[in-house]
Amino acid sequence: MTEKIRVGIVGYGNLGRGAELAIQQQPDMELVAVFSRRGKVDTVDPNVTSVHIDEAKNYQDKIDVMILCGGSATDLPEQTPAFASMFNTVDSFDTHAKIPEHFAKVDEAAKKSGKISVISVGWDPGLFSINRVMSEAVLIDGNTYTFWGKGLSQGHSDAVRRVEGVKGGVQYTIPSEEAMDRVRRGENPVLSTSEKHKRECYVVLEDGADPKKVEETIKTMPNYFDEYDTTVHFITEEELKRDHNAMPHGGFVI
């Protein structure tokens, strides 16, 4: 291929770094620039250009597609429609209840600009969706159950960190072993959200933050924690760095 696909990355957290590494493995792609609210960032490849997100509009003739690596809680609802008005885009928006609303906003922006936007192609929705489609195409009689974890949810961890008074934090999704056993036994149970998973949060507070207010805000957060059995643990910054710096995850489609 003589002409490579020119790619930009918006947002440079764990997902943004992963996108950079993935692009490095693709012979038909080149990373033009990383765009971040922080401006200059330390990219995996020090030769990659990184600029402030506000400068993205100046790259419309230099980039073929933008990979949007922000969080679903507050970033992508604003960023994807905005970037779809200037670029072809891809995002991994995963707030399931709000996908129709997100689609409508992005679709409107992309149609006005004549661009193409692909939304919600991450883990779930995304790879797990493909697993479900393949399984249901073969096993047409039955129910499909998805269990996430045990592992660290980057999206829910990001949502925790956006809460006022939170300095740092992570969230672990824990599937119910009892619920999975019932499914594996062929009972075809009807399971509520809270019966399938629990959520555990480990939070570092800002100085002077009210722990009760923070806990209540997390537990009642719509689309993230309000329907789950959620436990909030308050820990020190040292404990967060020592005990929660890995990002394991997994899951089951049954």
List each language-model region with its residue ranges.
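Rossmann-fold NAD(P)-binding glycine/threonine-rich loop
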Residues: F93-S117
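Glycine-rich Rossmann-fold phosphate-binding loop(s) that bind the pyrophosphate
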Residues: Y12
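Rossmann-fold NAD(P) dinucleotide-binding segment
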Residues: A56-V65, A73-S92
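Hydrophobic/small residue at the entry helix of a nucleotide-binding pocket
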Residues: L15
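C-terminal substrate-binding/catalytic lobe of Rossmann-fold NAD(P)-dependent oxidoreductases
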Residues: R6, G18, Q25-D54, L152-I254
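Oxidoreductase and adenylate-handling cofactor-binding alpha/beta cores
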Residues: K105, L127-N143, D158-Y172
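General beta-strand structural signal in soluble alpha/beta enzymes
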Residues: D91-S92, S117-V121, F147, V170-Q171
